Amino acid sequence: MSNTQQLHDFTTQVRRDILRMVHAVNSGHPGGSLGCAEFLVTLYQDVMKRNPGFSMDGKNEDLFFLSNGHISPVFYSVLARSGYFPVAELATFRKLNSRLQGHPTTHEGLPGIRMASGSLGQGSVSYTHLRAHETEAD
């Protein structure tokens, strides 16, 4: 999707999702999510090589490491609208037994999530570890 208007429309829908999710449960951090909307939409729709079919190994696709897990509303919306899981699931955000909690985790098997994110800054460490492991494997 490289059409500027399409990216704008996609981003507008993501922002609506963020506000609906956070408002429905009266919990979450809308500011960070709203501020990252263009960035994540552009990455997932125009820059990254990705696979909504998803496998944990991430072969033949670009990997995204989310450090600040409190922006999960934008991450969940972009993943859902990119085909990783049904958009209707966004309505379960932060509800009991939902896969969409306040910080993304891998234990619920949510497509598009490869690592739990909680501590700020852990994404850069995870990426560095992955690159070091790939270098050793070569």
Located regions from the model:
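Histidine-centered catalytic micro-motifs
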Residues: 30
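N-terminal capping segment at the start of a domain
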Residues: 11-27
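Single conserved hydrophobic/aromatic residue that forms the stacking wall/gate
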Residues: 134-138
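Generic start-of-chain signal for non-secretory N-termini
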Residues: 1-9
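Cofactor-binding active-site loop characterized by glycine-rich and histidine/acidic residues
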Residues: 6-7, 18-21, 33-131
